[in-house]
Design a protein with these regions (language model features):
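C-terminal substrate-binding/catalytic lobe of Rossmann-fold NAD(P)-dependent dehydrogenases
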Residues: 133-139, 148-308
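N-terminal Rossmann-fold NAD(P) dinucleotide-binding loop
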Residues: 12-13
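Rossmann-like NAD(P)(H) cofactor-binding subdomain of soluble oxidoreductases
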Residues: 87-153
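Conserved N-terminal Rossmann-fold NAD(P) cofactor-binding segment
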Residues: 33-71, 300-307
């Protein structure tokens, strides 16, 4: 199993590290345009192999796509990160050109690869890859919902004062502060609805804290977060590589599901060796369905900025 990560920044390096430590891939290639940067990250990570007990070979390269040939899975993290006060949508102009070029070069060397998009605005970048590459829709996946759901579960566990392993919850919708739809109505602690433990006011705070989770970290760090995004991506990669058939909320191209057409947005999917094996249609209450529809309108508006 060969995995390529494009972008040796904090998220890309974190992703490569988690994949290596989980020890399911034979090789991870890190590619970056900055001379020597990916090579340095790869060397540093390889020097942790004996300490972290993994056998994955990590290779770095400066913009040499021949090193990525025959990758089973490619992760695109390249692009400019958010700065404090920036929205994900403000990144669109620069990152669109980068993602379009990178996806084309990856497919030239690995025509059967599965692509996971991390670059922001993530739903629009995922849709851009669909529109510009023309490959099967099951082979293009946007990462956002898996990360947003992890942040949701963190906030739920915090509010419940419970072990995070007791908590289950999911975020669907767009990967943006306004577009996220944390499914409070379906969130549970050991299969018991969280509404049995928390007041409506407390649940509203959990919802809002989840939606601004990325912005909160950007303000604290001065740049985008990297540990949780890297972990989220590695979980998607592992489910695909090992055919685990796990369910994650991911940005997928919809064709009538949830009443939505021709856009990418976060919904629960089953991930296996073919990428998206199935899109799951949840039985949403009217409020959550309305929020998802509103989120889709926001994603479509962002798509239109690129003429998509």
């Amino acid at each position: 199993m060969k995995v390529t990560v494009v972008g040796a920044g904090a998220v890309g390096a974190s992703c490569a590290e988690y994949i290596a430590i989980k020890n399911f891939a034979s090789q991870v290639v890190i590619l970056d345009i900055k001379d020597g940067f990916a090579e340095g990250k790869a060397m540093d990570l390889m020097q942790t192999a004996s300490l972290n007990n993994f056998d994955t070979k990590i290779v770095g390269t400066t913009n040499d796509y021949s090193k990525t040939a025959d990758s089973d899975i490619c992760v695109i993290t390249s692009g400019i990160p958010r700065k404090p006060g920036m929205t994900r949508e403000e990144l669109i102009g620069i990152n669109a050109g980068i993602v379009k070029e990178v996806s084309a070069k990856l497919l030239e060397k690995s025509p059967n690869t599965i692509i996971i998009v991390v670059s922001n605005p993530m739903d629009t970048m995922t849709y851009l890859v669909h529109k510009t590459t023309g490959i099967q829709k099951n082979r293009i996946i946007g990462m956002g919902g898996a990360l947003d759901s992890a942040r949701f579960k963190y906030r739920l566990a915090e509010a419940l004062d419970a072990p995070i392993s007791d908590v289950d919850g999911m975020v669907i919708g767009g990967h943006s502060d306004k577009g996220m739809v944390p499914l409070i109505s379906k969130a549970t602690r050991n299969s018991i609805k969280v509404s049995n433990f928390l007041s409506a006011e407390r649940l509203d705070k959990v919802r809002e804290d989840t939606k601004v989770g990325g912005a909160t970290l950007t303000k604290l760090l001065g740049t985008s977060a990297w540990y949780a995004p890297g972990a989220a991506v590695s979980s998607l990669v592992q489910s695909i590589a090992c055919n685990h058939m796990k369910i994650f909320p991911c940005s997928a191209l919809l064709d009538g599901e949830y009443g939505l057409h021709d856009l990418c947005i976060g919904v629960p999917v089953i991930l296996g060796r073919n990428g998206i094996e199935k899109i799951i249609e949840l039985d949403l209450d009217s409020a959550d369905l309305n929020h998802l529809t509103e989120s889709a309108e926001g994603v479509s508006k962002t798509n239109s900025l690129l003429g998509l």
